[in-house]
Amino acid sequence: MLKVKNVTLRFGGLVANNDVSMEVRDGKITGLIGPNGAGKTTFFNCISGVYTPNEGKIIFEGKEIQGYRPYQINKAGISRTYQIINLFKKMKVYENVIVGMHSRLNSSVTDSLFKTKKEREEEKKAYEKALELLDFVGLLELKDEPAGSLPYGKQRLLEICRALASDPKILLLDEPAAGMNATEKNELDVLCKKIVERGVSILIIEHDMKLMMGLADYMYVLNYGKLLAEGAPFEIQNNPAVIEAYLGGE
């Protein structure tokens, strides 16, 4: 579904991603781990169009997308969340979800300005879809609350909900469990598996190794911008190089 081939990204003399190749398989949860500064979020930024790699290819559904802008990547079917929560905190919860639908809405400026029948029908459908997604992630009862009033873990779930609003085929999750307690992490685990059941593949960056080992079908490890290892979770967990670089060797 998504293939990244030999991607290199440089910032002057700094090589942030160095000849990185990986694949996100259809219907699977793919994990990406590595120590702080390994280049994981930078890699997400290459996939999502924030950065254009200096070398290599990013192929989504058979089409090269490196060089696409973020809105084009989103429209193509790749959505993401961020390390730092990026909600419109004064807007209602359901309104934040509707914002995530922007790449799928069809109303013109004229429709919006004059509130045409088409615009009213689209607003109704967007609202109904927002409620369905909020119910899916367990936030329906909070739909009318200001997003900023939600507990931190719930804000994380709202970000995922908003990312789902664009009907992605692949969802990039950047440390979604950060700041969550044990109960919330269990809920996140269940939610990710439900998302895959909806037909959305996931590429996830996460530092919680216990969560990742039970969640990912396949994993990649970055270290100093280079691919250190790949394999099934149990293989990664027992890989001496990974233990030394990330899990903490003796």
Regions picked out by a protein language model, each given a short descriptive name:
Residues 1-250:
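Glycine-rich phosphate-binding loops of nucleotide-dependent enzymes
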